[in-house]
Amino acid sequence: MSQVLGKPQPQGEDGGEDQEEDELVGLAGYEDGPESSDAELDSGPEEGESRRNSWMPRSWCSEATRHECWEPGLWRSSHLLGIGGGWRMLRRQRQADFFLDFSDPFSTEVKPRILLMGLRRSGKSSIQKVVFHKMSPSETLFLESTNRICREDVSNSSFVNFQIWDFPGQIDFFDPTFDYEMIFRGTGALIFVIDSQDDYMEALARLHLTVTRAYKVNTDINFEVFIHKVDGLSDDHKIETQRDIHQRANDDLADAGLEKIHLSFYLTSIYDHSIFEAFSKVVQKLIPQLPTLENLLNIFISNSGIEKAFLFDVVSKIYIATDSTPVDMQTYELCCDMIDVVIDISCIYGLKEDGAGAPYDKDSTAIIKLNNTTVLYLKEVTKFLALVCFVREESFERKGLIDYNFHCFRKAIHEVFEVRMKMVKSRKAQSRLPKKTGATPNGTPRVLL
């Protein structure tokens, strides 16, 4: 017998869910504050940071990324809107003086940086285009080599907020004229891409140089190695290549006396979902609320008879959290395919006849029944997040219990959103305060609280 997450309270005269006060088992202190509202929590990026195409569904088809390429004194910017088959790009270029404030201690916590590095033609730009721009893998064959540092702001939800910096392979950023310390100081993760179908000895040498220099500047960087383009290798060759690269890279670090540096290795390809799964694991390490999200998912599935649950960012198909059960690649691929189908159909048929309205709200769901008695169940959590569950048909007969437990889960997620939003606003407000120097009248040092 499944345990219900919370007890329903008496409803008001309108019987709406907004007047329900539920308790989530094991999570004390989750109470609606005076500033809590779905409108605020679903607002996504702050005002002035996002734009939305008027014909797209409000809940799902929102701004995915802001892409900027750096030249001295010039930022070229384009906005990418929508997802799935509804992706549209509004390109605009502007010339302006732009200066990055790397000294702001709060900016690195609010939006960490992910660096994409590697040799030329290793596939860095293709990864970025496929994951965050929904480019078809076959179209990446026509991409030109990157000849400048490109920065991309990813602001899909309150949890998925980071910057991706794509470094050209031919740039020697350790040149004396290049301030690499400024780059590494605010970096959360460094992804080094190695072409598995090419001779990777030079790539391993560059990897060692990059990791050792970056670690001296910032010991908190997560070092991730993408062994890329493995789609052309046999299964045995994939395993052998990963083992060889893993062994050589760690031996080089051991010879330099840097055994404490940890490298994570992933086999990736843009022609399957492996690149999305690898990016999911990279992004999860940058989410401070990950333990809370995983705990919420564990409580939810254990009390609802659900086999597996993912919390997806629907724009990029990166899952920001899952329960403690192992992740199966086929399960993840089914979730990604379901999101594509649901979003593409919604962009076509979800709007009203006049093209207005919001076809998705907090009650929107999608159900797909498979031939193996498994049900895929999708529920919208926020404008950018969706919960995708795997449920057996016999367990799905208790859909009322699942929906009620989901209501408790969604409410707890919104509470986590609210805490993060308040923290971000507080840090931004502190960063704008003028720094006080000198001493107080009694001669003691002045401390800014």
From Swiss-Prot:
InterPro entries assigned: Gtr1_RagA (IPR006762), P-loop_NTPase (IPR027417), RagC/D (IPR039400)
**Tissue specificity as recorded in UniProt:** Expressed in the distal tubule of the kidney.
Broadest EC class? Answer: hydrolase
The processes (GO biological process) annotated in the record are: positive regulation of TORC1 signaling
**Top-level division of the source organism's lineage:** Eukaryota
Q: Care to name a GO molecular-function term for this sequence?
A: GDP binding
Give the residue ranges for region: Disordered.
1-55, 428-449
Task: Name its cellular compartments.
Answer: Cytoplasm; Nucleus; Lysosome membrane
Physiological role: Guanine nucleotide-binding protein that plays a crucial role in the cellular response to amino acid availability through regulation of the mTORC1 signaling cascade. Forms heterodimeric Rag complexes with RagA/RRAGA or RagB/RRAGB and cycles between an inactive GTP-bound and an active GDP-bound form: RagD/RRAGD is in its active form when GDP-bound RagD/RRAGD forms a complex with GTP-bound RagA/RRAGA (or RagB/RRAGB) and in an inactive form when GTP-bound RagD/RRAGD heterodimerizes with GDP-bound RagA/RRAGA (or RagB/RRAGB).
What name goes with this protein? Ras-related GTP-binding protein D
